[in-house]
Each structure stands twice: as C-alpha cells, then as structure tokens.
C-alpha cells in the first residue's frame, strides 16, 4: 500500500438546528460585515439567515443563477465593493455557493456556506463560471469555504424531485472520485459511505420528504461525496456535464443525473477496482444500471431530451467534449462518445 492523503476541507458543523450556530461562527472567524447571497427564489431563506446575525449584515445580493454567468459575478462584486464587506454567507445550492466562490476567487474573502441541496460544491475548491456559452472551471484554495453549516431541517423545503436529482449529483462526485488517479483508501471509504447513504435515503425522501433521519443521511452522504470530489481530479462525467450545462444551458443536477450511468458504463471496462467498490456500495453487480434504475424509479429524468437538449446539438456537444483530451481511465473515442450522448439523449439504458 502506497498513497498520499493531504485533505483539503473546510470546518464543518453538522446537525438539526445547527443554523443557530451561525452568529457564534462568525465571531470565531472575526467576521463583521457580511454579504448574504441567494437566488431570487431563496431570498426568504436569505432573510431568515440574516435575522440570526442582524448586526453583521452589510447587505444582500439575490441574483445568483445557474452556471454562474460572468455578468452576474461582476454585478455581485460591484455590490460587495460598494458595501465594504469582509465575507460572504451563502445559504442555498450550487448556484449561490458557486457565485460566492467566484467572488472569493477575486477578493480572497472568506465564505460561510449553508447548503440546502446535496450538490456538494461547498466542500471543494473547485469553481466554475460561464462566459460566451462556455463553462470554465478551475481550482483555487481561496474559494474553499471557511465553514460549512449542514442543517438538515433546511432541506425540508427542497422539492422531492430536486432532492432526487441533487442526491444523484452528489453520488456522481464520489463515483468519479473512485477512479481518479488521486484515490486512496481513505477517500475510497468516504466515497463508498457517501454513495450508500444517498442511495438508501433518496427513495425515503421521495416518499416522506420531512423524514429527518433520511434528510440527515442524505446531507451526510453529500458531505462525504463533496469531500471526495474536493480531493481528486475530474474526468469524463464532469467534462460532459460542464459542456452540456454551460453550452446548452441544461439544468445542473438533472444533467448529472442523466449522464452519470452512461459515463460510468463507458469507463467500467477500464476501472475494475473502482467497479468493485461501487458494487459493494450499491449492493449490485451492475453499478451503472443500478444508478439508471435509481433515477428512473424515483421519478428523475433519464434522458437529455426531457431536460431541454436538442437533437441537433448532439454533434456539437461531441465535438466540444473531444476538443481537449484530459485524463480519463478509458481514452476518449469520438464514435463511442457520440453513441454515449445519443443513448443519454434518448434515455436508453447505459452500455459500455
């Protein structure tokens, strides 16, 4: 056995009611002038968070949006400068936390993330921004949240459909982590536990959305899966999703949900060790098919067509994916990638 484990992770507060610790956490971090960030739809949550720290709120920015458009980043940065803030508090999902990351990248100010979905972005130093219909990603320690507060009670309002796709989005992070070059025994255990926790909790959340134990297990799984992604490099799955989301404006979690079984099936012949770990985590001999079935049986989309992809754009998507080779367990083959995209578009079962 020979490996390096150099974890890059924020401080984590976890548990029902943990949001009430926000004021104490800001004092611990020496934070005094907060910009509270949200999407327009989650402004009420932003107000709820601000009410806990009335003396520390410098202002709000409630125009966060999917895929972090560069013009929104510029608008938020201008507001932050005008208010003279010293930090960002980001209650919400990937859109809100993603915007906070881009602001931190340019200002080096700390983030306190309060995730309300299972996307896992809060646990990584990965950032992304969309400019001219192309999504660019990178890594930088400046964008890693200083503290993450997981309060499963905040996920009660997450619609069941979004809960399912957000959970599968998190699973995708850990799946890709299991065949990353940086994987080690510790990350493998975290990935397996995260995948198992989410796979078990998703059906319960769909049938009982306010089941606190299921919501807690899902956030626990999201924390683990996000932590794995934060310590490994990304490969085919995330490349596909960034291309489809950033260029064709497909919804983030739904795109991950649709693509995951197909990207895994493509790589399966080249990842025997990771496949064995996945078989154990999902209690199945066919992990790719099991993930397809998990999505379909819980009402999640299984086709790109159903989430807004146009058939006429499949060729362009394939060209974009093939335009820059990058590390992947199985070399990228244009004909095979085109077939993968076609199956994902139609919602057909995954194939190697």
From Swiss-Prot:
Keywords from the named record: Aromatic hydrocarbons catabolism, NAD, Oxidoreductase, Plasmid
Biological process, per Gene Ontology: 2,4-dichlorophenoxyacetic acid catabolic process
Top-level taxonomic group: Bacteria
Pfam name, any one: ADH_Fe_C
Catalyzed chemical reaction(s): 3-oxoadipate + NAD(+) = maleylacetate + NADH + H(+); 3-oxoadipate + NADP(+) = maleylacetate + NADPH + H(+)
Molecular function GO labels: alcohol dehydrogenase (NAD+) activity; maleylacetate reductase activity; metal ion binding
Pathway the protein acts in: Aromatic compound metabolism; 3-chlorocatechol degradation
EC number(s) stated in the UniProt entry for this protein: 1.3.1.32
Family: Belongs to the iron-containing alcohol dehydrogenase family.
Protein name stated in the entry: Maleylacetate reductase
Source organism per UniProt: Pseudomonas sp. (strain P51)
Upper classification of the organism: Bacteria, Pseudomonadati, Pseudomonadota, Gammaproteobacteria, Pseudomonadales
